[in-house]
Amino acid sequence: MNQRRRSHTVRMALGEFELIERFFTRPVQRAVLGVGDDCAVLAPAPGMQLCVSSDMLVEGRHFLSTVAPQRLGHKALAVNLSDLAACGAEPLAFTLALALPRADEVFLQGFADGLWALAERHGIELVGGDTTAGPLNICITAIGQVPAGQALMRSGARPGDELWVSGTLGDARAALEGFRGTLDLPGMPLAALRRALELPEPRVVLGQRLR
């Protein structure tokens, strides 16, 4: 393996069902039916509406080939949780579609560790998905719930409203461009910005408080 560039391709050692069972199956408590059937079954609380968001991450465009698997698992879920937060939704469940060049067990364990750690923090359950062979590609669909009529929407802004920003704008993009070499950044600031690119923090609680 080239030490200057971590490869996510090692060897095909697992079949699809074993891969799902080992890394992406856990008991569900909030979903009626989770991983293992043709569809998941969810039961939102009375008086709630569902919010659904999907995001795809592609190697080289959304994350670096050198990213640690744990950080990639975190980021894949975090970007979807951020969309739920933007609507003020409470996270419920998510699905994961994962294309892999090879079933690298070390990569999969790290990816799953990062994914599950964030999922447990926000009480969101993995209820389904798909795996296939192909270039590394990750797609998560997250589902949340919000009291009927209370979802935060972009169309809700009016002239004269205050605009509040949490966090720092542009850090993740600056890090990505810096590592690509398209933005000239010194080493220390670039290393500091890398956390924003690889470990974004979804503002789930803040989103619910803003409803």
Regions found by a protein language model. Name each.
Residues 1-211:
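Helix-biased detector of long, well-ordered alpha-helical tracts
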